[in-house]
Amino acid sequence: MSDPTASPLIWRDDGMPQSALYGDVYFSSADGLAETRAVFLAGCDLPAAWAGRDHFTVGELGFGTGLNIAALLDLWRREKAPHSMQGGQRLHIFSIEAHPITRDEAARALAVWPELGEAASVLLDHWPGLARGFHRIDLPGFDATFDLAVMDVEPALAAWDGAADAWFLDGFSPALNPAMWREEILAAVAARSAPGARAATFTVAGAVRRGLSAAGFQVDRRPGFGRKKQRLEAVAPGVAASPPRPRRLAVIGGGIAGAAMARAARAEGLEAMMFDDGQAPASGNPAALVTPALDAGGGPRAALPAQAFARAAALYEALPEAVIARGALKLSVVPRDEARHAAVADQDLFEPGTMAVLDAATATARLGEPVGEALSMSQALVVEPARVLDAWRGEVIDAQVARLAHEDGVWRLLGSDDQLLAEVDAVVLAGGAGQARLWPDAPLRPIRGQTSWTDRPLAFPTPAAFGGYVAPTRDGMLFGATHDRDDVGTDARAEDDRRNLRALAEGLPKLAASLADAPLRGRAAVRATTADHLPVAGAVPGAAPGLFVLGGLGGRGFCLAPLLAEHLAARILALPSPLPRPLSALVEPGRFSSRVATGAV
């Protein structure tokens, strides 16, 4: 396996960044920013092309140093329409980079153009990592969302479900990197283009002209920049359109799924109303351990929790005082765990070095009692649920939605006495195991779980997982949890506290012994899972348009909910999802449709 930390970039004597793989420069030695503005921004008729559009999507082949995106953001912030009572314009950016560079390398490259100012700063402050897959990047203050695909161009285009209004075709020279300019790639670009989309590139190579023409673009040569005599502009058939999109969303459920949904909806300009009847949400513990479900086999089932984990960690780190602790150890419990941990540590789905196998001596020193080998997850977090929910939920309407009715494109939320609670364009069911009231045939199974905690401080700073888990709270420690299928009781049970203590003794007997006389508090809640142990995030099958579900998160709600909520917000607004297609297929509620008799009521 190649070294994932090896830089694909070298610096020439004149200070220009050059690809170590292809031998080509990242941008023009004459003036890279001027070239970007002439070739890509003007070549795609920006800013005129986004005038009058609520949402505008730009795709790019070859993220490189981020110069094109920084220049685009600078132009967007200066030229987008101001906010109005109907909201404001939103920009979505999708770029592909098979060989990403580091934030420090990008900062050195972009420092040549201080005029990019805040646009370059926000990009560098949220610079994506090196893990393979899709990265959702926040660009605060720019009304923009950025998804970067760290993978080869062909699978990246196949995985993206968006349709770009403009394309920056900026790979290295066709002579040095011909694979990126193949006819199949340009056909895939066309397939991911909106009607009337424009594409621009610096090259006029015959293979590129023919490939764009064969894909259906009208191709024209234009005067080039600097020493290049010509460049290309291309226009896809059709006329650009701005279809009407939902404005008002109701979120039913006030736990982490609902809170994440409200945050994601508002980030995309939706007005989100939250309804919660306060019936023991599953997100009410004093601490939540945020770790991904691990799959040593790789593939989509491993990639989904890995991508969700990275996104969740970034969002929680941005919340003031939400993080209680960082890092966690997953102990080897059975002999096969050592091989599984080694396989996970070798996966490129996580940032390099963030999953590492520790020998028994090192793990023992970390935890203060004898343990075997362990997997160190340095980006794991312990968060305080109340701070996350308070930051994301917004105003909560204390009411039980007893029934939903759909008429003339409007969803009506009705209370227990059939009183009208709200009229909205779309509804998300995010009530966990309580979905059955509004979706009787939901493919969700209830699992009761009880956690236990004490005000005695945890002797070591590192959370640990061992079948059960233990994590610090603000003023003590939490451990657990029980898993009882088809039990919907939310009463705290002394026997379950004892079960949790016995499970703790199997993983960390010294710690468990120290708690033998400690007063324990327990809290029980009912979580929802599915037959295949994967969540559901999408349209409710069999229901009228505009009804969606986010659920089946099991015990991984704080890991999965933030990214899946962004995926669902994209589905609601017909925008590009942050999930690659193979991952979004895993969470489609319709995968159970053969067993679903009716939609929601």
Swiss-Prot record:
Q: What is this protein called?
A: tRNA 5-methylaminomethyl-2-thiouridine biosynthesis bifunctional protein MnmC
Which intervals of the chain are annotated as region FAD-dependent cmnm(5)s(2)U34 oxidoreductase?
Answer: 252-601
> What does the organism's lineage look like at the top?
Bacteria, Pseudomonadati, Pseudomonadota, Alphaproteobacteria, Caulobacterales
Q: What does this protein do?
A: Catalyzes the last two steps in the biosynthesis of 5-methylaminomethyl-2-thiouridine (mnm(5)s(2)U) at the wobble position (U34) in tRNA. Catalyzes the FAD-dependent demodification of cmnm(5)s(2)U34 to nm(5)s(2)U34, followed by the transfer of a methyl group from S-adenosyl-L-methionine to nm(5)s(2)U34, to form mnm(5)s(2)U34.
| Family, per entry | In the N-terminal section; belongs to the methyltransferase superfamily. tRNA (mnm(5)s(2)U34)-methyltransferase family.
Please provide one cellular component term from the Gene Ontology annotations of this protein: cytoplasm
Annotated catalysed reactions? 5-aminomethyl-2-thiouridine(34) in tRNA + S-adenosyl-L-methionine = 5-methylaminomethyl-2-thiouridine(34) in tRNA + S-adenosyl-L-homocysteine + H(+)
From the Swiss-Prot or TrEMBL record, state where the protein is found: Cytoplasm
Q: Which residue ranges does UniProt annotate as crossing the membrane? A: none
Q: Where is this region: tRNA (mnm(5)s(2)U34)-methyltransferase?
A: 1-237
Q: Which superkingdom, per the lineage?
A: Bacteria
Look up the record and give one Gene Ontology term from the biological process aspect. tRNA wobble base modification
Gene Ontology molecular function: flavin adenine dinucleotide binding; oxidoreductase activity, acting on the CH-NH group of donors; tRNA (5-methylaminomethyl-2-thiouridylate)(34)-methyltransferase activity
Keywords associated with the record: Cytoplasm, FAD, Flavoprotein, Methyltransferase, Multifunctional enzyme, Oxidoreductase, S-adenosyl-L-methionine, Transferase, tRNA processing
Q: Which Gene3D superfamilies match?
A: D-Amino Acid Oxidase, subunit A, domain 2, FAD/NAD(P)-binding domain, Vaccinia Virus protein VP39
What's a Pfam family in this record? Answer: Methyltransf_30
User: Recorded E.C. number(s)?
Assistant: 2.1.1.61, 1.5.-.-
Cofactor(s) required for function per UniProt: FAD
